[in-house]
Amino acid sequence: KQIMTLVLQLQTPRIGTYNLSCGPEGLFILDTNEKRIDLEILQLSFDSIVHRPQYEVVSEDINNNVTPDLKKTKFSNQYLLIPQNNFVTEDVKILEICKFLKPTCDLLSINFFSQGGPHIKFQSMKLEKDEYKINISQNGITIYANDYGGRFYAIITLIHLISYYDSKLPLGEIEDRPYFVWRGMHLDCSRQFHTVKHIKRLLIYMGMFKLNRFHWHLTDNEAWRLDLNCYPNLARQSSFRGYKQLIPPLYGSGFEKSGGYYSREEVKDIIAFAKKLNIEVMPEIDLPAHSWALTQVMPELYDHASNMHSEDVGSYKNNTINPSLESTWNFLNNIIAEISDLFSFHIIHVGVDERPKSS
């Protein structure tokens, strides 16, 4: 074996300094015949160890046992006993939610489908969107809400409380509704591809903390991940990267072909899954800049006769589509029409950020 030493210099981005490193992920070396040489990367050595900050422990009270904080609680020092965290759930609207959350509840050893234990009842009440009330007494638990979101968040609050108190709940009342209309989470699936399974896992975490907007970043310089009928080759050609692929290795992807895209059926599946968690899915199609992958497949979207050579903050050259071309507007009309039909949410995010000044 031949030992090769590589000295890596940490680059400092314009938005700040990274204090951690994953090392030379994706590194590969070719011989003069462009054949890949087998590598064994030994343990990295660093000049100094990064010390992570220690954070103060938050005091333990009821509002810190449910995240986000509940708006109003009134509990006594008495408890409703719940042997083995078993509940009897009979209301159809509550059962619908509990069935969907069963895999998560199984992991937490919470059973909403027992033949014995406190009964969970539901009563409709005129409340605000996503607002709910819970009454806990020795006779059982009653949930009050006006819509699906209120019922769903009431169950989520019970899951948090049961996980904390274990086999009992304090008697009393809860009144709660979200502090903000928009409670979002962003996931960049362009720079790194995430499977449908992983996205659903993130959505479950979002639902457990009452977030209601999934900002799905589907396109950027590095890939176009959304499969569209109007341009069937776009995602299939730009969503994979690797050596001698249309999109070169990026972000540690390495020599082999890797990546993926989301079919229309997968998108519909994710949207339906998110709705059961009271989450709306907002797609982001990043334009007019951040479009390097797009322009590799559809070079007619920028003007080849122009002598302008732009470069963005990520060192991508000519990554901006040209709004003065008829082909650009035809493209925009086609994709917006199809995306609007595919996604049920009323907003499409179009980026409009970091356009190179010379573009």
How would you describe each model-predicted region?
Residues 137-329, 338-349:
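Feature activates predominantly on carbohydrate-active enzymes
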